[in-house]
Design a protein with these regions (language model features):
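N-terminal charged helix/coil linker that caps or initiates catalytic domains
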Residues: 1-25
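Short acidic active-site motifs
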Residues: 14-15, 103-107
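E1/E1-like adenylate-forming module used to activate ubiquitin-like modifiers
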Residues: 95, 100, 111-153
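Conserved N-terminal Rossmann-fold NAD(P)-binding element of oxidoreductases
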Residues: 26-28, 51
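Hydrophobic residues within alpha-helices
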Residues: 36-37, 80
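Hydrophobic/small residue at the entry helix of a nucleotide-binding pocket
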Residues: 32-33
Length: 153
């Protein structure tokens, strides 16, 4: 538990242990999603289901954690899995190298305790919201643009 000793200032031992059994979906692995994924892994979440059909571009280098010059053209979800494995090998990452759609949402969200929206489009966000409602999975919405951000549940 030494890895998580600083968590004890905000979470109880039982809550820390509980995180290991949680499965959280993070949909969108770019700017916001990369930070969410990294913090959840550092916090000690047991399983992360990540989905993103996009690839890294040079314009991502200044703001996306999983990007570097060696991953240009590579899928964001697959690269997030690699990065998380070096940060916390105890966190299992199930990576989907495709965008969430109405057709694949059930597969991606299966068994998740909560879904994190880190998407950059309203259409895909509505698909996620509907799937979460249908599957009775709580959803946390997040968005950023420049110096502004928003979060809601």
């Amino acid at each position: 538990m030494d890895r998580y000793s600083r968590n004890m200032e905000m979470l109880t031992l039982e809550e820390n242990i509980s995180l290991r059994s949680k499965k959280i979906a993070v949909i969108g692995c770019g700017g916001l999603g990369g930070y969410i994924l990294e913090m959840l892994a550092r916090l000690g979440v047991g399983t992360l289901a990540v989905a993103d059909g996009d690839v890294f571009e040079e314009s991502n280098l200044n703001r996306q954690l999983s990007s570097d010059t060696g991953v240009i053209g590579k899928n964001k979800a697959l690269q997030a899995k690699i990065r998380i494995s070096t940060i916390n090998p105890d966190t299992e990452v199930i990576a989907f190298d495709r965008n969430l759609t109405a057709e694949n949402a059930r597969e991606i969200l299966s068994g998740c305790d909560i879904a994190m929206d880190a998407l950059d489009g309203v259409g895909s966000r509505l698909v996620l919201q509907q799937a979460c409602e249908d599957m009775e999975i709580p959803m946390v919405h997040g968005a950023i643009s420049g110096w502004y951000g928003q979060v809601s549940t």
